[in-house]
Amino acid sequence: MTDQRGPPPPHPQQANGYKKFPPHDNQYSGANNSQPNNHYNENLYSAREPHNNKQYQSKNGKYGTNKYNNRNNSQGNAQYYNNRFNNGYRLNNNDYNPAMLPGMQWPANYYAPQMYYIPQQMVPVASPPYTHQPLNTNPEPPSTPKTTKIEITTKTGERLNLKKFHEEKKASKGEEKNDGVEQKSKSGTPFEKEATPVLPANEAVKDTLTETSNEKSTSEAENTKRLFLEQVRLRKAAMERKKNGLISETEKKQETSNHDNTDTTKPNSVIESEPIKEAPKPTGEANEVVIDGKSGASVKTPQHVTGSVTKSVTFNEPENESSSQDVDELVKDDDTTEISDTTGGKTVNKSDDETINSVITTEENTVKETEPSTSDIEMPTVSQLLETLGKAQPISDIYEFAYPENVERPDIKYKKPSVKYTYGPTFLLQFKDKLKFRPDPAWVEAVSSKIVIPPHIARNKPKDSGRFGGDFRSPSMRGMDHTSSSRVSSKRRSKRMGDDRRSNRGYTSRKDREKAAEKAEEQAPKEEIAPLVPSANRWIPKSRVKKTEKKLAPDGKTELFDKEEVERKMKSLLNKLTLEMFDSISSEILDIANQSKWEDDGETLKIVIEQIFHKACDEPHWSSMYAQLCGKVVKDLDPNIKDKENEGKNGPKLVLHYLVARCHEEFEKGWADKLPAGEDGNPLEPEMMSDEYYIAAAAKRRGLGLVRFIGYLYCLNLLTGKMMFECFRRLMKDLNNDPSEETLESVIELLNTVGEQFEHDKFVTPQATLEGSVLLDNLFMLLQHIIDGGTISNRIKFKLIDVKELREIKHWNSAKKDAGPKTIQQIHQEEEQLRQKKNSQRSNSRFNNHNQSNSNRYSSNRRNMQNTQRDSFASTKTGSFRNNQRNARKVEEVSQAPRANMFDALMNNDGDSD
């Protein structure tokens, strides 16, 4: 596009003294289409006059001649960066069609819209149609045709000369001359259609060689085809005669000679075929192999053709007396084949394909007949293989064994230390084609007897969904929604819910199973079993034992129990004893204890006390309940019970005597001697979960339970203060001589149980009066010395510190004070008290928050008050009365008379002496 503008016309003068320039498309700021300039300066800063024949350039440019708008190195027209029209802000308009520029003009005082790229196909002008030029990766011109060559070779790779082959056949029959055969061999053959490769779509070639397909070539092709058909007929007739046993010796010799001639003359026969112009196909589509059958003929077609391509058709050599006419059997009949050479291509009708398929089938049958039968060769059986392997010498190390050269050794990576023989897949697969064995009936029977197929597998086998067993669904089924299929399956499942026999699991009814079990029992041989003879000393439940005699008391009504039965009944009743059933069960125990009134030695009473004592020591948590049981027995026991060995003590006093004597005996022995000890007599540290561990745990539990039981007996005044003084003195004696942890734990348990009550107890002797508080002061001094010594474990040390704080700080107010057995009513009462306490705390917190908000409301007024001296007013804060109340309580308790023992009437002065 050239610039056709001439020199600018002279500028007319305006009345106001300013020059008015004519409008140009590419001026600095002149308006287009002769529109008036509406700027404030009346276009004062318009374009400069031409200087040195260079338009739109100031005279003395600061940066030389190439300042802003000089486009010496640019294209065509001069355009400026501030032109708001005509492709604004761009220096060229090459991206737009010139015919489109006039339509892009905008009136004055309007900014041009943002311009976008418009494809050439969308340009609304009469421009040449846009055509996409395909990429041509082939450097050769597309008009040059590709020549395709086909090489026909035998099975051994030698080329087959069809030319000489036809000449020999024609010479033998005298039908045509050799010259005619040469011309026919150059023409197209029926193989050209199969051997023609499929050209890709981007390499479509125009048909430029249509002149070669004329009437002469067509006639030669027909003659060659006719020759092939004749050879096929002869070949078929010879095969039929051979099959029927009618072939003669002369024909055999003739076929043998023909076969030898064919083998000796096998030069290359190259058939050039013209490229076929076909419809474009996808380049990724693979070319199919034309011929591949048991006749041995195969055509190799490459996937991509870039130049002159040579294709080889390989024919297997005949294996029997038949000649090399196997090639001719690809065509069956001349009348069913039509060849069309129009537009340089060759077309074979559907009848040709059917003919070739039938001929290939016939050839397959022929080859099957001529090949030696493999069934005639005797193959070894699997049983023989197993027998041979059983006799063979085993290999000690398969990885070190010397294998033959053609055998690949097993891979060492499959070696396992726990398994002797481990082979990899590569080692085993190399014998796939080398070892062939046939299954013999004996092996089949032995293996099939070990295979069990559940009946439900065969019943649930899916039906044949297609002709070949595959899942051939119709297009409508393929597009079915997954939800619909799931609904159908759920409906089927719901229908099967009523009948479990059609479910996936093998279901048999109970009746069927019972019948099957009965049949199995009937079939099983019955063994004679000797009748069971009961032993004389067998165990019999007591409830089923029938007493031959029943002992009755002298009154004739009360039944007397023997020693074993008393122990059994006591254990049963003590196991059922709870605070809810305390009255009823304790009454039954008291009835058993009253049986001693018919005895002289109090044997039954001793058994009752012994069982209660063992139960109390073994269950320390329930010690308080068993102490209450002892108190009831002492209080309600029949006073007529006597013991001839303890004269002067009867009834309740006898019970206290038995109880105190049993507690004193066990307390003196302690529970350290029951721990497992070594050869030197020192206690051992048993292993966890061992027998010694459980023995030590039981001894510790019973020892601490004894101390706890003695403490609760003292709290119930069944034991006097003198007895408790003796217990503490014995413990303090042990504390002075390097105490053991067992002794310290006994002291801690006794203080937790009786500390509060013993603090205010006192014992009067003829010499002086002993107070419990004084004894406890001496005891805690010893404990403090042990704590400071640091020779004990941290567990015992912290327990001693807790007991010391319990007396000095908490004043025996322990949270564990009420820990013990409780009735259901007591548990409900405690829960109700706890709930009320929480509610009261919540209400108090709300009240305090309300008062705090009110106090904050008047805090500003209090801040403004004048500060006074702290000692100028008396504080209204009341002191804590906790210490005063505590001291007053101590004074009252000291002033009170000593508690009267509830069993003082029973023990009198003799109780302390015990």
UniProtKB/Swiss-Prot annotation:
Gene Ontology terms describing biological process: cellular response to glucose starvation; positive regulation of formation of translation preinitiation complex; regulation of translational initiation; stress granule assembly; translational initiation
Keywords: Cytoplasm, Initiation factor, Phosphoprotein, Protein biosynthesis, RNA-binding, Translation regulation
Keyword Chaperone: no
Annotated region described as Interaction with PAB1, given as residue ranges: 201-315
A single GO molecular function term of this UniProt record: ATPase activator activity
Compositionally biased region (Polar residues): 26-44, 298-325, 339-348, 868-886
Ranges annotated as biased composition (Pro residues): 1-12
SUPFAM superfamilies: ARM repeat, Eukaryotic initiation factor 4f subunit eIF4g, eIF4e-binding domain
Sequence segments annotated as region (Disordered): 1-84, 128-205, 240-351, 457-535, 833-914
Transmembrane stretches, start-end: none
Biased composition (Basic and acidic residues): 156-195, 240-263, 496-529
Modified residues (Phosphoserine): S74, S503, S913
Compositionally biased intervals (Low complexity): 59-73, 145-155, 841-867
Superkingdom of the source species: Eukaryota
Modified residues (Phosphothreonine): T196, T301
Domain MIF4G intervals: 567-810
Example of a GO cellular component annotation carried by this entry: eukaryotic translation initiation factor 4F complex
Subcellular location field: Cytoplasm
Principal localisation: cytoplasm
Known role: Component of the eIF4F complex, which interacts with the mRNA cap structure and serves as an initial point of assembly for the translation apparatus. Stimulates translation by interaction with polyadenylate-binding protein PAB1, bringing the 5'- and 3'-ends of the mRNA in proximity. The formation of this circular mRNP structure appears to be critical for the synergistic effects of the cap and the poly(A) tail in facilitating translation initiation, recycling of ribosomes, and mRNA stability. TIF4632 is probably essential when TIF4631 is missing.
PANTHER family: EUKARYOTIC TRANSLATION INITIATION FACTOR 4 GAMMA, EUKARYOTIC TRANSLATION INITIATION FACTOR 4 GAMMA 2
Note: Present with 3390 molecules/cell in log phase SD medium.
Subunit structure: Component of the eIF4F complex, which composition varies with external and internal environmental conditions. It is composed of at least eIF4A (TIF1/TIF2), eIF4E (TIF45) and eIF4G (TIF4631 or TIF4632). Interacts with PAT1 in a RNA-dependent manner.
Family of the protein in this entry: Belongs to the eukaryotic initiation factor 4G family.
Name of protein: Eukaryotic initiation factor 4F subunit p130
Species of the source: Saccharomyces cerevisiae (strain ATCC 204508 / S288c)
